[in-house]
Amino acid sequence: MLAAPVICASAVWVAAVAGCVSTIPGVPRVGGDRGPLSWGPDVAGAQLADVLLDVAQVNQIMGTSAMTVLRTYDQMPGDDGTYSDPTCAGAVFNTVEAAYKGSGYLATRSSDVSDGGGKHYVDQGVVAFGSGADARKFLAASQDSWRRCVGKHVTYNAKNDSPITWTIRAPVTAGGITATVVDQEAGDGYACAHGITAKSNVVIDVSACSNGMAEKGVTVASTIINAIAGKFPA
């Protein structure tokens, strides 16, 4: 979605909060051999909302209590701006039409959670495909795209806000999850972690932003994804 860059543009930059990531009990820790890729029954579009985290879980992971739900989506939001490099838009932002167009996805559900000032922001999305094979195909294509975009500077030009440029770091894959960090240029340390995986017939695609995210981004993205994956039907 495109809410993250808009919120970041208006945020008042603050110092990084060290060690603010917590672990949800029962969720595999990042870096282990266990990942979310165990295959269960397919998830229907009507079930997607059930696997998203509630606001309390998001607050716990992000180490705050001030975040609330800004909006939820049951459609892929259309791009209301332009990218300097559309082929890398999917590496910077999660669940954007520029990345999913032509993929054959069937349904999507996502929610934006923020503290209102942009200090902490999470966009969690789940996208259903017709089969597990289709979901894994999209995951593999995304992984290839992210690797090709390493080091690139991607500017998003929103219709009603100032342009924001992001620099893409090298992705890391562990436990079935691929995650990268994108740094906001001239953002005083503000960065977003972007993580993606596939479980059953669903792609889990999340973004988490805050100051200091560069140091902990892979862990944050993986923790959110594992928590979502843990809510899938067995």
State where each predicted segment sits.
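N-terminal export and membrane-targeting signals
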Residues: M1-S10
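C-terminal motif of bacterial Sec signal peptides marking the signal peptidase cleavage site
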Residues: A16-G19
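N-terminal "mature-domain start" segment
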Residues: V21-D112
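Short Gly/Thr-rich strand-loop-strand
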Residues: Y73-M76, D144-Y190, P233
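A short acidic-to-branched-hydrophobic micro-motif
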Residues: T108-A140
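Short, surface-exposed beta-strand/loop micro-motifs that present aromatic residues
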Residues: T108-S114, A191-K199
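Short, well-ordered beta-strand elements
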Residues: V122-V126, T197, N201-S210
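Surface-exposed amphipathic alpha-helical segments
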Residues: S210-A234
